[in-house]
């Protein structure tokens, strides 16, 4: 049975839509807490990519630079809004495929090498 997983999937869709809408409408270079807004968008995307499934068995995207997910740290890489939207598209598909692969019982289990249950990981991303 995967009724809870399907509910999670449906509740995840507006989160991704909100991120997409933000990237399509924000002033990417406006400063927010000392960093350009695009860095905060990347921070949210990277967190969803890394923490929704298993942060302890995760491979950084090819374009990622160490510390790039922390908007308060300087980085050389500058991602365009198109690149951010492509990354979002990748994360959405990865997340939906993952949720489709789960059963409700699996939400109470900890993924390999992870100290959190799958449900904890999901809930952490909803609050993020």
Regions found by a protein language model. Give the residues of each.
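Helix-capping and short linker residues that terminate individual alpha-solenoid repeat units
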Residues: 27, 100-103
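Short, contiguous alpha-helical
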Residues: 5, 9-13, 17-20, 25-70, ...
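Short, helix-capping/interhelical loops that line the mouth of catalytic, cofactor-
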Residues: 1-7, 47-98, 105-110
């Amino acid at each position: 049975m995967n009724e809870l997983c399907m509910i999670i999937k449906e509740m995840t869709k507006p989160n991704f839509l909100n991120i997409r809408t933000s990237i399509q409408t924000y002033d990417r270079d406006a400063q927010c807490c000392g960093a350009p807004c695009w860095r905060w968008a990347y921070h949210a995307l990277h967190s969803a990519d890394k923490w929704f499934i298993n942060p302890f068995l995760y491979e950084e995207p090819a374009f990622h630079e160490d510390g790039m997910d922390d908007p308060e740290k300087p980085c050389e890489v500058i991602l365009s809004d198109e690149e951010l939207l492509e990354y979002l598209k990748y994360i959405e598909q990865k997340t939906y495929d993952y949720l489709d692969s789960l059963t409700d019982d699996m939400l109470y289990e900890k993924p390999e090498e992870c100290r959190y249950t799958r449900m904890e990981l999901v809930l952490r991303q909803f609050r993020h």
